[in-house]
From Swiss-Prot:
Native source species: Salmonella typhimurium (strain LT2 / SGSC1412 / ATCC 700720)
Name of encoding gene: cbiB
UniProt pathway: Cofactor biosynthesis; adenosylcobalamin biosynthesis; adenosylcobalamin from cob(II)yrinate a,c-diamide: step 4/7
Protein name, per record: Cobalamin biosynthesis protein CbiB
KW Phosphoprotein (keyword) present: no
Family: Belongs to the CobD/CbiB family.
Amino acid sequence: MTILAWCIAWVLDFIIGDPQHWPHPVRWIGRLITFVQRIVRRYCPGDKALRIGGGVMWVVVVGATWGVAWGVLALAQRIHPWFGWSVEVWMIFTTLAGRSLAHAAQEVERPLRKNDLAESRIKLSWIVGRDTSQLQPAQINRAVVETVAENTVDGIIAPLFFLFLGGAPLAMAYKAVNTLDSMVGYKHEKYRAIGMVSARMDDVANYLPARLSWLLLGIAAGLCRLSGWRALRIGWRDRYNHSSPNCAWSEACVAGALGIQLGGPNNYFGERVDKPWIGDAQRDISVDDISRTIRLMWVASTLALALLIAARCGLSGVA
């Protein structure tokens, strides 16, 4: 039944994703973060106090998320086993973001194919932190490919990884870790102190999933009739060409698979950030690379699910 729940949740994400008006735990987690952050800022003046308060905020948000998820599942199971199972499927489904990621990328891709730069820049600004107002088509393509490659880890592979380790409650706790990082884990002045713990704990949580993504995306590249060997080679060579210890694993693998370069200079919050280049520019990046990257994401996601099912069967001895 556990494996069936995983599969149904994955299929639901593949088919319908996250409908905008449906209730979603990540939105609730975001509201909790906003509430706790307001309290921390009120009572923790100064950088040192903010760092400590940020650590407390991380424990409160992640702990509360795990506890509520565990409690809701336990209560649902007591009401009826099938109800508990249905709630588990829903929880797992909400931790996966493959369809949402693909949809967001396609929202940028469509106007870009029509040479509508203004619209593609606006749509891109919804999913990236960099300044998109002056980006040219190649830069927009690169930003979308990077976003899909990076979020293949924290939107799909990592939730499945923590689902395997600790069930739906731990997968939900991971989403809290990831949401904390996306809301406060920045290096500029406003968040540097309060978000330090959140940023570092996100690095810790994604350490193994990011490295697993290198292998899965490399295999996916071969299955998609791209260069799997080059994906693995470039992925390994450029795995540390990023300020994050995790992001370049998937980005470099995708760059190798496609034969393009990612990274380079960008503007964030009004400041120029010069990132190392990732991959070799064997050809110019094109809008078609967006759809190729989405395909890589889905194949890697399928491989991740299959791997974890096989591991579960191997450990439990049952299908």
